[in-house]
Amino acid sequence: MSREDELLEKLDECENATAFLQVSNKIINLKLKALLPKVFVQDDLVKEYAVDPLLKEDGPLATTDVVSKLMFAMGKISLETYADIGLYDQVLEFVVTQSEKVEFADDMIYDFIKNQSVLSSQQDSFYLESINQLKFSSFESFSQMRYEALIKTVLKLSCEMLIERIEGEINQ
């Protein structure tokens, strides 16, 4: 089982949105770094002396933000994909600065989901419609549990869909 697959399974174990965002951002970073060598000249010498040093843990391409900017600048990922990667990164930066863990039911997580282009396509808009129905329903305690479970499910789906889109755009 790959590190990415292990982390995808760990998403189900996350107790709150803060933990979820930390794991999902690791997954996105791993996927970007795994695909990054494909955007460069495919030459062993170039890979050994230029690409590999860039990808080291302490190299200039260590952060998700820098890697996604490079891929976007090279025309390898779309603006929508770049924006979604940036949104994951920005929301993570925000939640880790909070004194308390951010919960799945937090309005900020709702806004995060609403602003993802990967979920705003016509075919995937039913996820947002389902969330809206539960968020604004009147069955408080029952709906709250279902709402949080739905948020977690949609977050996991959005992460998986973003990973698939990144891979599809890089490999085309």
Language model feature labels by segment:
Residues M1-F72, K76-Q172:
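Amphipathic alpha-helical interface elements
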